[in-house]
Structure formats: structure tokens, C-alpha cells
Amino acid sequence: MGNAAEKITPAIAPARILIEAEAGHFQPSRLEIIDQPKFSSGKGIALKSGQLVDIYKPSAVADIAYEFNIPAAGRFDLFSWAATDDAAYCYIWIAVDGETPRQKVVVSPWKDLSICKELLQKADLTAGRHHIKIWLPEKVTLDRLELLPVRIHGIPDSAAKYNPSIVPPATRPRLMVTQQTLESVRKNLTVGENKEIWESLKKEASNPYVLKTDTPPPPKSKVKSKKPSPQIIGVFEDEKALDIAVKKAFVCLMENDKAKGREAVKLIADYISKAEFGNQLDVCRKIGFLIYSSALVYDWCYELASLDQKRIIRANMMRLAEDMEIGWPPFKQQVINGHGNEAQLSRDLLSMSIAIYSEDPQPYKLCSYRILEELVPGHNKDNRSGRHNQGGSYGPYRFGWDVYAAWIFYRMSGKKIFSADLKKVPYFWIYMRIPDGEMLRDGDIFTSGKYWSYAFNAFLDYTYSNDPLLKGEFIRQDGMNWAKKNAVLFLLLNDSSLKAESSLDRLPLTRYFSDPLGSMICRTGWSFDRNSSDAVIEMKGAGTYFGNHQHLDAGAFQIYYRGMLAADLGLYCFYGTPYDINFNKRSIAHNLMLVFDPAEKFSEGRGNDGGQQVLSAYSPNGKILARDFGPDLQKPLFSYLKVDLAAAYSNKLSSYTRSFCFLNLGLNNSPGVLITFDRLATVKPEFKKYWQINSYQKPEITTDGFVITSIQPENPGKLIVSSLLPKPSNREITTSGGNDANTVFGRKFQAPAALPEAAGWRTVIYPKVASREDLFLTVMQIADGKAPPLQTEQLNSQVNIVVAVADRIVSFSRNTATIKSAMELKVPSSRQQYHVLLCDLETGKWSIKEKSGKGLFNAVVKPDAGTLFAILQSGEYIVSPGNNPALPEQ
């Protein structure tokens, strides 16, 4: 056996203590030393082939035993480095100084599996000799252990000197309810939908509850550590106890039932003093829920707790606060985005700080500084858009914690900390909802189900905004079932007098989202049924790239009609895997322009997908140049967006603009048309330009484009794609997919799930002849499976590029500049009249006359639109800048 005592040199200072894996006592019959070039010593230790984890026998002997010296007492972080071939959670078991073995994550599936670093636990160690025992799992090679003194993050001077403008009241309760609001909450308990939930809560709170202090006996069979055991050894969690304790405290508060209040205090004091958590990702969410629940009981039952119980609860809340990802003091993470913008600060630590404010005001000062001086100003800027930068799953989740913080402050002080724009943001997810109950994809998506639900967030949204439409959305998400499981929060905030409005028909069919996330979502209706005839189209612009779960997809589009037609192909499982950073989050998984420079390098080992550059967070990725919809703002005939996207790409592009125009045709079998017009110039003509669209099924190539059919088995939708530019003589169309769907210019990445996206198809249009500048004009007709193609033609002039489809005409500037001079417009004779949209016009007054000289009317082109809409008979016209006093105003 190896001898740890002989091989480890005692540290002369507690700054860093390194323990090589192969330097301990181990059983040669079970373990072997393996060469690993990436490891610190070039070697590691692993179980021999055929050996299984055997910890569950009482007489089990550790696989490896280490002995080491600590020259000075301190609190240490204990880290491990390990490797595996399996992209799954891998667990070791560890015991420090004879304590009960604890199961800890040693490899996380999204990290570098060849050398994965994990924080196993914290350890308070005295000066002198210490021991660590390790039980290894299969297929894991241990590199080393390392002890580092726990780093306490400093408090910025501005936070240390901060005097909050809003402080908790001296009276109790003060958390989620105050003396001023207590009576209204009590009166609302037996009104409307609250009554049943209140009666059920009281019944549950009346039952005694025994804390589960013992770990259940482990199964007798051998268990592979790749999957966690039913109860992780050495980890004590009992979330049911928290639920019961808070319900007892709530009944105490509502009915002055002191007996239940004392029961709640005892449950929390007993639990929090024993609670211990593992090291798996996001464990801070469980820790935080314990802190929050403890804070509620501490505040609501304050007069019923003994001095010793108060001390225990306060001390352990502060102990657990150190294990939060954001740390304590809470400055380890930024709060505008990421895990720092979740419950840990906005609910958990904030609630703790309010509950203990009378005894210690420092925690509240630090939490309120980060929220009121950092999070609120930053998100007030973001909320102007009405869109959330973290997309369809993480967006509502993180936004919900903003609203939670807003509720906590409002209930405590009567003051609203966010601007009124906060109330706009929930409508982003309403507009993203597609008829089958899912949503258009945006960012990393983990939501599933027939009707994607985020009822917790929808509840906070409608209660804070007092909005009947948002309450209707909560009901659609099976919200009342959620309410039964979250009875205390529901009864605290739900106003039974607010009646849910189920229909969304009074909402405009197009919604524009402004800077910093400029974009537009267009709908043809508000029905939610898989066989609905409603289409949903997203035209994504640009503004700011925030990073994290946001994708590199500025300028992308999506189309839904009886199934996804223009789809995102990325799937999200784990953050930062090779597939995630090379395909899922990258431009190639989206419907946008790719420009391939074979010499382009992307950061952090990412491959070249020809797409947008990996920007640092909060960088500009383009800007909206023009936008408009109308003429009826409720049911617009056209929706137009123009965006400058050059900033989203590297310097391989010298300029790039994309114009979108969605035409709502109002036809049963052809609800609409999406037109994209791209003008881009590269610094070198040989850089290949690709107009890309993704689909779940293989497209059928046609003479002028291709047809995509949705995978919906009954009444599928189809997308008839016509490429008008490049011209046919200079145009190639290719498609690839199935097993090659996730291949990025020769490099294949394995998708994490067997969903339609994993075997989708990527179709590209590109010019045959290399040129510095190219134009792409593409018309996409949305239709049911039996509808014939609509007639499409070009009617170009020297000034503009014109598309006619069905009874619509859309004109774009032929040049990069806006149109400032008179131009001719030919309206074909195939129909009696057309709805005409002229884009890219100079701001100001314009007039339209027949070519024969008869004047028709004047119109004003708005500076943020650059458009002129008119209904014209077939014929020839002249559109001129300037006002003709003899003509009527449009």
C-alpha cells in the first residue's frame, strides 16, 4: 500500500495544502495508479476494472486514506480534481477526521471531463494532524485534493457606507405582511378561490410533524455512484418540515394561535441546527429555501420564540448564508444576470436580513445595497424593452425573483422599487406562446409539457400588476393546482376580487420590443389549439448582448403555423458542454445569415460556425434602424423591422442590414408572408455568405427555392420559400440534416436528447460567384398543406427593389441610403388594388400621384419608421418627397 504519512510534506503555512491522490494508503487489490498527462503529477488513482462501490456494508473499509498536517487552525475549502469518461454526475464518498461519510459530486457532466474541479465541502480544522477517507466510484480517476483557506469576499466601500432609503419597520410582522396589511390578508382568506385553500392549509397545519433526523437505511445492494442514492449520505434535508413549519406560523399569524406558532419555531430551530447540504449544482436553491422559511417563522412568531431559539435560528441562517453561491457577504456574484439574479439575494438573504434587522442591521444594509443600487437600476434599463434577455425558460424564472423582491419591499414599506416597465415584461412570454401550448424558442430552454408552465412566476406577475389578463394566463398554466401546493404565498398575495380574463383578443396582434432588445412578434390570432389556423412569427432585431443563457442569434426569425416551420435546432441540457457552446448557443442553430471566414477564431476553444462573434456581456450587437406596423394597430396588415447587425459579427463584415416584413393576409389557408431582405458586405469577397433556415423535416427543393412541411401529423403547415435574390443564375440551394444536423463545417456534436431538433435540417441559399457585397431577397409563404403557392414577382426600378405577393407590394431601397428622391412605382394589373408598403424612405412629407399627373394624397414618413402605406389601384405612380398643398393628407 502507499503511505500518505511518508509521501506528504507538512505544509509550513495554511495557504495551500496539496494531497496527490496516489499518495494515500490504498488497497492494491481494488485500486491502481493510472497515468494521466493532464493531472498535476501525471498520475491518478482509480478502481480496477470490475470493482464496484461497496460503502453500504457497516464494516466497509475506505478505498484511500490520507493523513496530513495543518500548521495553523482555520476554515478551509476542500477541492477535488478528477476525470471520467461518462458525461453524468459522478459521486465520491468522503469522511474528514472520522465523521460520517458524505456523498459529494466529484464530476459534473458539463465540465471538462478530463480534469474536473469541484468544491467538496468546507472544513473547520485545528492545527495538527488530520485524516481524510475516500470511497471511489467506478470510472472515476482521482487526481488530487486541495485545501485552501476560505476566502471571505470584501465589502465595497460604497456598500459599507450605504444608508438605505427604505428600512424595515420596528414593528412585527415585517416580512411579506405588516401591521398595516395584516387585516386585509385576514379578511381575504375566506373570499372566493382563497377559501378552499385556506381550509386545506389549516387542516394540514393542525397535524403534528416529527422531524426526520435520521438518514433512511441505505439499500443492501451495491449501488453505482454514477446515480445518486435515494438519500445522499450525510446530507440532511426535510423540505416537508419547512412547508409545515411555515403553514403553522401562518395560522399563528392569521388566528393568533400561539400553540402552532411555538410548534413552528421548534421545528425550524431543530431543523436548521442539523441541516446540511451536498455540493451538487444549484444546491444554493435548497439552502436558500431553508433560510427564507426560517426568516418567515422567525418574524411571524418572534414573540413566541425563546432567546435560545432566536439565537439558534439567527446563527444558522448566517452559517448557511456562507454556503450560498453569492456568498456572505453577498458579493461573490453579479446581480444583473446569472445565479446572483435569482432567489438567493432577491428572496432568501433579503428575507433573512429583514427578519433579523432589529438585532443586526448590517445584513439588510448589504442586501438592500445590492438590490436597490445595483439590480434595480440595471433592470429598469432592461425592462424598457418589455422583453427579457434570458429567454423562454430562464427569463420568467429570473424575472420572477425581481417581482418577489418588489413584493417584499412593497409589503414592507408600501414603496415600489422598480419602474412601471416591470409590468410590461410578462407580456413577452404571452406573445411568444404558440398555439400548441409551447413557445417560440429563445435562449436556453428547459420547459416542457403540453402547455409550458411557469405558474410561480405568472402568479407573482398578476398579483403585483393586478392584471386580469395575466391572471388568466396563470389559470391556463394550471395555476390553481400550483396554488394548492404553495398555499401560504397564494393567500398572502392573491386578491380574489380580481377576476381572470381568459381571452387575449383585446391585445394587438403585433408587439414591438424596444431597446436594448429590439424585436417584434407578430400573430394572426390568439387561439391555443394544435389545429389552430393562427401563425406566430418572431423577427428578432438587436441591441445588447447580455450573455449567460442568451444565444448568438441577433437578426434571427422563427415561424410557427400548425407546427414549427422555421425552427431553432439547439437543445439545452447542460451549460457549457461542447455541444452547448458549439451548436446550441451558436448562430448556426438559428435562422440567420452565416459568413464563413476559414481563418476566423472564436474564444475559449469554440469552433468556427460562420456565425456571430462571442461578445462579452453587455456589449452592443446591433441597433434597430426602423420599425412600424399598421395601419390598424390592433390587427396590422404589415409589421416591419429593419436592423443593423454588423456589430453582432466580427470584422469579417464591413456592413450588414436585415429588413423583415410580415404581411398578415387574413386568408384561411395562407395566413401570412414573411419577407427578409439582407444586404451585407464582407472585407474579402471570398468569404462565403449563407442565408440559412432550419426545419424539423427535410425540405423539398423547387426551381426557385424549397418547401418546408411541419411534423404535425394532422393538418400540417408548410412554408413555401422563394429566393428572388441572388438571381437564379447565381444561386445555389443545399440542405443537410438528419444525422448531420449538428455538424458544424465538418465538426459533429452529439445532441443531448432525441427530440425533433436533434435530427433537423439546415437549408442554405448562397451565391455561386464570390463578391464583396451580396443581396438576399427571400419570400416565405405560410400556408396549410394543401394551399397552392401565391403569385410572387419582382417589380424593381433604379431606386428600389419591389416584391409583389398576393395583393401586397413591399418596396425596399436598392442602395444602402434611404430614398430621398422621386421614384416610379408600378402596380401590376393582375388585381384591381394592392396594399402597398414603401420602406426606406427619408423622414418627412411625401406625395403620391399617378404617372399621368393626377395627384392622389400627401403622407408623412415618421423618423422611426421610414415607411409609407397606401392602397393603390393597378397602374403607374410617382412617389415624391415634399408636400403638395393641393392634395389631401392621408
Where are the language model's segments positioned?
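Extracytoplasmic
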Residues: 5-166, 176-178, 845, 849-871, ...
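Short structured motifs
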Residues: 49-52, 62-66, 116-120, 627-628, ...
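Residues that flank catalytic or metal-binding motifs in active/ligand-binding sites
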Residues: 62, 88-90, 119, 128, ...
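Acidic/polar, glycine-enriched structural segments that form the non-catalytic walls/loops
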Residues: 148-217, 228, 253, 298, ...
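Aromatic-lined, polymer-binding surfaces characteristic
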Residues: 174, 179, 189, 194-198, ...
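Carbohydrate-active enzyme catalytic cores, enriched for enzymes
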Residues: 356-359, 397-565, 759, 764-775, ...
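Catalytic and substrate-binding regions of extracellular carbohydrate-active enzymes
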Residues: 480-712, 770-785
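Beta-rich accessory regions
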Residues: 507, 511-515, 526-532, 634-889
